[in-house]
């Protein structure tokens, strides 16, 4: 799958744009250290944007009927994404909770795969959080879903306000976790517990 996406980008166009960008900032793209930079950067972006054109919901290929009606939480799913405003990375961890409906559960790795697909594109953290929750709701129709994403944004660290170490936390809730503050708080406390 990765190889397929890497080959689907317009490699020549991406390399030409990076070459022109180097010229625009006053660099010589033909000097020794930069000779292969357009090719390397185009390849890197192809990898970083592997999620483009994919639906995170499609990652939920394994759905099982189990006798489990209590909350399922997967914490600390590491991810890297790219801020669509500045095209610099933001990275962090996603925490996902869902309350199965009729015992419908998914393979735990499928949650991590959905995060991977949703994060591998120019993205906003708020949208990333919602896309993960929506994919889970569409795939499993759980009684409740809660997604929390914590991330450090290089656009706040490297430029502008320059506040390294600051984290942005976004949450989104669906179903029972949206309707019941007490249920939501209980799940958040489990997500944030070490």
Curated annotation (Swiss-Prot):
Short name of any one Pfam family annotated for the protein: GTP_cyclohydroI
Signal peptide span: none
UniProt record, GO biological process: one-carbon metabolic process; tetrahydrobiopterin biosynthetic process; tetrahydrofolate biosynthetic process
Entry GO CC: cytoplasm
Keyword match Zinc: yes
EC number of the protein: 3.5.4.16
Protein origin, superkingdom: Bacteria
Swiss-Prot/TrEMBL catalytic activity: GTP + H2O = 7,8-dihydroneopterin 3'-triphosphate + formate + H(+)
Enzyme class: hydrolase
InterPro entries, sorted: GTP-CH-I_C/QueF, GTP-CH-I_N, GTP_CycHdrlase_I, GTP_CycHdrlase_I_CS, GTP_CycHdrlase_I_dom
Residues given in the record as Zn(2+) binding sites: 83, 86, 155
Keywords: GTP-binding, Hydrolase, Metal-binding, Nucleotide-binding, One-carbon metabolism, Zinc
Entry GO MF terms: GTP binding; GTP cyclohydrolase I activity; zinc ion binding
Pathways involved: Cofactor biosynthesis; 7,8-dihydroneopterin triphosphate biosynthesis; 7,8-dihydroneopterin triphosphate from GTP: step 1/1
Coiled-coil residues: none
Iron-sulfur as UniProt keyword: no
Homology family: Belongs to the GTP cyclohydrolase I family.
Complex formation: Toroid-shaped homodecamer, composed of two pentamers of five dimers.
Protein's UniProt name: GTP cyclohydrolase 1
Phylogenetic placement of the source organism: Bacteria, Bacillati, Bacillota, Bacilli, Lactobacillales
